[in-house]
Curated annotation (Swiss-Prot):
It is found in: Secreted. GO terms for cellular component: extracellular region. Belongs to the gastrin/cholecystokinin family. Magainin subfamily. Antimicrobial peptide. This is Peptide PGLa-R3. Its main location: secreted. Expressed by the skin glands. Keywords: Amidation, Amphibian defense peptide, Antimicrobial, Secreted. One of its GO terms (biological process) is defense response. The modification Leucine amide is found at L21. It comes from Xenopus ruwenzoriensis. Disulfide bonds: none annotated.
Amino acid sequence: GMASKAGTIVGKIAKVALNAL
């Protein structure tokens, strides 16, 4: 559902942010 999609998006952003560090 939308909740799972939102969670996936947040996870992707978090991974990108950590990689940027």
